[in-house]
Amino acid sequence: VKKTGMYEFRPGYGGSMQNVMEVDGKEVHRKEVGKEIVRTGIKLEGGKKIPFKITYLTNDANGLGWIVRLDVPGTLSALVNYEGKYPYLKNDKSQWVARDDVYYKGVVTATGSRWLGVGSGKIGPELGFGHMVGNYDEDPVLILKTSQGNRSLGWDFLPPGRKQYEYGGKIYAGYKQSPESWAKGTEPKPIGWYAGKQYDDCFSAAHEVLNNFDEQFPHWKGRGYEIEGFAWWQGDKDRYNAGHASRYEENLVHLIKILREEFKAPQAKFVIATLGQTAKNSAEGNEKLILDAQLAVDGDAGKYPEFKGNVSTVYTHPLSQGGASNSHYEGNAQTYMDIGRAMGESMVKLLEGK
């Protein structure tokens, strides 16, 4: 192998899987006729040649096979199985286990409808977030995720009520206007998208779920629901547009207020997470504008007294394991778990009144 790590051998294909394989004197695979496969991981040193032996138990030997690295850095399985992180994701039989008190429903993208747990080979902040709020609340928890990547608050997610404005010689669209911007003094030529369309798509999908609560969640039929809070981790696309970055704070304040109004949840808590790559001591330009905006709306910052005790911002740079928002943090599961957990912990503090 090229890299040092823990590996699992899967020799044979079809009937030839029935064999016993040893690597460097250690049995790593056993599949006897009529019995279950037994595989044992082995640590191998990158670049080092080692002997192996395969004893086929049928006449179907074909020599095909492959190996799988078990401890790929940044994967959830490696973090749990080899670094001892997030032990609550597995049961005492070392099987991934779903919670029976936190339910996940995803719409638009990241779709799914299941009890919160590991699966599908994908991860989002909702996994860590759900465990934190689930541990806090005695009542069952519903996480309703409505999301779409590569969307800006200044254009795609622009909330209702935002007006057009001028910046850098351009007029930027207000809610429902199109296109995104146009030269001052010219007539705008609409395109097949408008300011706030992603807001409309995402939150109308959320309404559709909640308006049909009993049908969507028959296990909670007749119980009803209460919206306790919103979680918002966004900002990547806005940093590529100076006009959008300049209004990020105003738009975020309005988003908080309008979501509470739209979902008839005036007391709902609001947790925001900053972009993981953006550091306080080095941020510049548009990235600094967005970071400063996200930090400014935190109720403890003092700029918005009405947000005291009900809006909190999580500074995520210390939690990011590298990469950036535009690369989905290189898919590092620890980044998503730790930021999700931090957002959940922040939500719990707001719910506790701390």
Model-derived regions, located:
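Acidic/polar, compositionally biased interaction segments
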Residues: V1-V72
